[in-house]
Amino acid sequence: MQQIIYIANAESENIEVWILYNNGDMKLIQTVQTDGQVQPISIIKNTKLLYAGIRPKNRVITYQIDKNGLLKKKKESIVPGTPNYISFDSSEKFLFCSSYHADCISVSPLDKNGIPKDPIQIIHNIEGCHAAKFNSKYNVLFITSLKNDCIYLYYLTHFGILKSTEQKLVFSQKNSGPRHVIFHPNQNFSYTVNELNGSVDVWKISKENKVLEVKNIQNIKLLNDLISKKYWSSDIHLTSCGNFLYVSDRYLNSISLFHVNKNDNTIIFFKQYLTEEQPRAFCIDRNNNYLIVIGQKSNKLSVYKICQKTGELKKINQYQTGNGPLWITSFLI
């Protein structure tokens, strides 16, 4: 099995394809021009398709991933508004595209070849709609509204139409700016990074008498007891074992490591690491061995070895990327 890392470079208008070797070394094997600023990229594993959001023409380009991890363009599809985040439902029949600038989320069915059709639903007035992530256990789409300090909650119907849950939405702290959302492997807890106040919210998800309840159980700062005059937090990821959570901040140029409490899934600050300049995104490889950070300003990536016992990071490699790297994801072939 070979691990492939894909990096979206907005200013260079391309996607880079890298091999990640078992020892943490990397090698660039392909650069694909995107004819526009590429931002979010997301992969459906079963069909080996990569989807890339392109601006300013507001498109999603579908690429086929071959046996070596290389990309071949298949089709372009139109989406409403500048794409900021691409995700899918658990059956991988529907594509969700968030648009921060258009304040909307769209739902596009995928045809038999995995190509997005025209949207069947567009929900407007989600101010600062930054990300959407599907919880398969509860059949709920979590949609972050950065400008309104809230997360909208929608059930997904059989035909792909989103319907408000009984709770409709949950609020984060005022002027916090919820940006990205992830789920614990057990799907009963969600973690959101707040861009504007440099914090993480932990949410407990449950159902009582078939009614969904999402409840905030913790808010914790990225710097523990230290205080910064400004925050610009960006990305959040959890190891697949559910033990270690990492959060990046572009103003602090840092990665914060938290330990996940196995009893209640709250998090405990452990350590902060200085990293690439303006670390907009990072990913954890499929084996939880490496964390790879891209610097939007440094135009470089750093590879960190993850300690399996503590989650601590040790920098082992650094490479030059294209200009303005905004997104990174991994794939196992």
From Swiss-Prot:
Q: Looking at the UniProt record for this protein, which Gene Ontology cellular component terms does it annotate, in alphabetical order?
A: cytosol
Kindly tell me the pathway this chain contributes to. Answer: Carbohydrate degradation; pentose phosphate pathway; D-ribulose 5-phosphate from D-glucose 6-phosphate (oxidative stage): step 2/3
Check the record and name the InterPro entries matching this protein.
6-phosphogluconolactonase_YbhE (IPR022528), Cycloisomerase_2 (IPR050282), Lactonase_7-beta_prop (IPR019405), WD40/YVTN_repeat-like_dom_sf (IPR015943)
The record's listing under SUPFAM superfamilies reads: Putative isomerase YbhE (SSF101908)
Query: Superkingdom of the source?
Result: Bacteria
Physiological role: Catalyzes the hydrolysis of 6-phosphogluconolactone to 6-phosphogluconate.
Q: What family, per the record?
A: Belongs to the cycloisomerase 2 family.
In Swiss-Prot or TrEMBL terms, this protein is called 6-phosphogluconolactonase
